[in-house]
């Protein structure tokens, strides 16, 4: 579960920290209030493309840190240990980008390649945007969902059927 998001010198935000409560959280506000900036910052800390354009005017760099409670995500803890990263109940993801475009990613204080952050994010977060339900209208979507739900068991059954 996402516990907090801390954003420093990102776009128009000098310093902002959002603490999340367990359950459902909602960002609301008028146009221009900064909701999209927070969503963009969250994407960056999860491994999305980070442009130097996000560095706040007058700053040398920005950083974004997200803290997750991973006590109920044992497969993530196993992955972290495989990567040589100490796995505790709190997971700290941090991404820093300089005005020159240099990026640095850390997990629990250990510098990692961006690919590690992206892999971790797939085990933690599922982000859905506006109109993404349209993907369900594609012909292959229902089959993909059934295959994903069935997992390896479905693939084994299909292989056995094809062998007959």
Segments the model singles out, each with a brief description of its role:
Residues 4-145, 149-164:
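Gly/Lys-enriched N-terminal cap/neck module of very large, oligomeric protein machines
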